[in-house]
Amino acid sequence: VVKPQAEAVASLIPSKLGEVMATVQASQATDPRAAGVAYTDAKALKFKADGSNLLEVVARANRILNGNKVPFINRTLAVGSGVAEVFRKNKDLLNVSFSADNGGLLRDATIAKVGGFTVVEEPALPDAFAVFYEKNAFALAVRAADVPAGATFGDSVAQDGFALRHICDYDPTYAEDRSVVDAYFGAAVLDARRATAAGLA
């Protein structure tokens, strides 16, 4: 009974981080120095649905992060399902990525490596959203709470790399055992200069 409970709790954690990532502002398509806008804004930098401007959008993101003195290593491009589809339709890009990789991309469920970014799909992100970031742009904290002294049984369980609390006790009101899995978790933008977003036209 613990495994499905732990899976259910762990599945909520990426959604929280996805909500935080979706707040990152996009560069304006015509002027990278202008104030950022929401990725849904008509002025926002966007991938074309036919994929014809993939490299241009990635180059713009690099320009913005480079201008903010963001390190070149540990750069990731996390994309929603709609943007992921655009990348997957670009056979030339995928062929280059896979031929240079010896199979690691497939093992890691990575879409491609392009312009210094590792491209990954994140279902918790909005479909038409992409966020370019360096690993220190965001923080995710997950903590298993202490087991209360009154619990009949309590322990930590691991699920998808997260530590969760499992407690059991008896509920006399309903004459049944209770099993609860929970954790404290939160996400935040640590440094907005280390991330920029784009939408999908």
Language model regions located:
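Short secondary-structure transition/capping segments
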Residues: 27-29, 65-76, 123-125, 161-171
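Sequence/fold signature of self-assembling virion shell proteins
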Residues: 42-56, 88-201
